[in-house]
UniProtKB/Swiss-Prot annotation:
Pathway: Glycan biosynthesis; starch biosynthesis
EC category name: transferase
Compositional bias annotation for Low complexity: 129-148
Organism: Oryza sativa subsp. japonica (Rice)
Protein name: Soluble starch synthase 2-3, chloroplastic/amyloplastic
N-terminal signal peptide: none
Amino acid sequence: MSSAVVASSTTFLVALASSASRGGPRRGRVVGVAAPPALLYDGRAGRLALRAPPPPRPRPRRRDAGVVRRADDGENEAAVERAGEDDDEEEEFSSGAWQPPRSRRGGVGKVLKRRGTVPPVGRYGSGGDAARVRGAAAPAPAPTQDAASSKNGALLSGRDDDTPASRNGSVVTGADKPAAATPPVTITKLPAPDSPVILPSVDKPQPEFVIPDATAPAPPPPGSNPRSSAPLPKPDNSEFAEDKSAKVVESAPKPKATRSSPIPAVEEETWDFKKYFDLNEPDAAEDGDDDDDWADSDASDSEIDQDDDSGPLAGENVMNVIVVAAECSPWCKTGGLGDVAGALPKALARRGHRVMVVVPRYGDYAEAQDVGIRKYYKAAGQDLEVKYFHAFIDGVDFVFIDAPLFRHRQDDIYGGNRQEIMKRMILFCKAAVEVPWHVPCGGVPYGDGNLVFLANDWHTALLPVYLKAYYRDNGMMQYTRSVLVIHNIAYQGRGPVDEFPYMELPEHYLDHFKLYDPVGGEHANIFGAGLKMADRVVTVSPGYLWELKTTEGGWGLHDIIRENDWKMNGIVNGIDYREWNPEVDVHLQSDGYANYTVASLDSSKPRCKAALQRELGLEVRDDVPLIGFIGRLDGQKGVDIIGDAMPWIAGQDVQLVLLGSGRRDLEVMLQRFEAQHNSKVRGWVGFSVKMAHRITAGADVLVMPSRFEPCGLNQLYAMAYGTVPVVHAVGGLRDTMSAFDPFEDTGLGWTFDRAEPHKLIEALGHCLETYRKYKESWRGLQVRGMSQDLSWDHAAELYEEVLVKAKYQW
């Protein structure tokens, strides 16, 4: 075939026609001479065939005409410049009315009819390097304002929008010199396209499609171009849906541009093809929209999104938190630990965390349901079966661990000998550390990622040890952390070293348990090992943390606390206002009691006092001060100090009510006081939640002579109920109480600096004198106490900071 093509190519003769006269043939005309038939490749038929080139047609001799040509994809650009091209490959225009030329075929080369007297540049170019100007012997006139306003200097076609042809190299030809009667036509060389464009299918006429150009200059001021102020009709989007093959080839992003066309482009801000719309879908822009409308719409949508999706209070710090404690209010409680385990998890849940509380199942709790999980754990050399019960209350998962060792101990949680207590706590900690894997709370277990255990006191101090020894040392639960909370360091889980094997730990862990006590000698200390293994440690008040570092307040663990001071934090407890709130307290809604607020303090609190006097069999007197004590009966709470001050108290015109359980000798003391001073003293042995609420509401004074108090909750409850505290200034009592100043009329109650009977008598005497003689000052104490924000929400925020520190600790 190559020889036939070469032979046929030699038959072409090229002659240049020249004329000296202006009206003669144009300079630079390329005239093709017909050649004999040759074996040529027929692209339309897809085969070789004998063909003769068509005879050349004379070009019209019009001096005022410009010619616009275009080529199909893949056509040689040199063939476009060849003379003798078909008329349907040209567009001729003059100053008169323009008519579209004839066309044999559709597709890319087809001329699309447009409005106006000046025909447009071809919509789809050949993809060549640049537009070519033929017959440009005379220099082109300076660009007009219309030409400057068109993007990339494209030939104006009755509109100022950006067309594909203006960026893809349409072939432009023009006459040598325009006629005098014809307005000058601006011919500007087009730059090479920045990115290729895949053309739509040629089976049907293509719709008009405008691709925004991000490199275009800013548009002229409004009114400078009359034609740009008249928007054209928007293309019919239905044509886009019909052509499934049309798409745009992605190119590099371009900077932001301002459109000069009144028709909005698809993407306004940046040339981001990831956001580019699909041609098969309707156009999102509507007629008449502009940039300002779109910006306003985006801004309003953003504001709505921010309002509707504010997110949790914890923000990106949302975590899975498991609180592990030996007691939890309202199911089982002997002191402040039960209140913390019942209230803190709810406050954390309100901040957006997923929270679980794990406690032993001491009795039959109606809210808890058996989840059907059975596990076996070894405690003190014995395999014991464990069942899991679950309840979901106030946004918190409560998981109860059921085992024979825990049953029927509702009223004696910490009872039994040392070996029995240790056996229960070993089983409890082993079962609790695997709860996030086994218990499907809400159908989805917590898992071991983004998880923090919050252990409380020595009863659960083995949990950080088991977490590290069983799992983290073996490559499991690597993203699980543990925080140990110190509520009372006086109870440490001490035992002989030879009982260490009962804990089922590796032998080298014995070094973490060994502790030498000058009094007791060498022993195994569970609390000490937990403090070492925990990622973070929290005390229930900053003052208590300071005391723990001293020899007197550290109870033998002060050296460990000093060594781990970097991970210590002091956070004061809060109040669960849904349970401890005089305005909604359910225990004040019967038997003559009444709910009250600051506004109704003067009328409703005396009603609670009278109801309490009647219920306990005391004389109903509004003028007599009613003193209350609520707490555990042991040496820490200082109830024996009250016993030493009893002769002075019995000589005053007062009434005294004591509620608590604990040491048997102290229980007998309460019963003896009631028998000796039956008209003034009542001793309630045991613990009653209802009676605790009613004493707090009905008493005028709450006395707390604790020898040490890590935080203390009863003084917080008392202030919230308008009851004035008299406390020993130690630990958390010092942090939460400020002494009354009669000259400045400030403070919340009375404090004394030593746990001695005469100091208690001195502070209590000042309190009673103020109650009897200075009613306005007394009411100021009540109002200031009730006006404080003592909720758990602030404490939960501080706990969250500690949890985040533990999370990112390695």
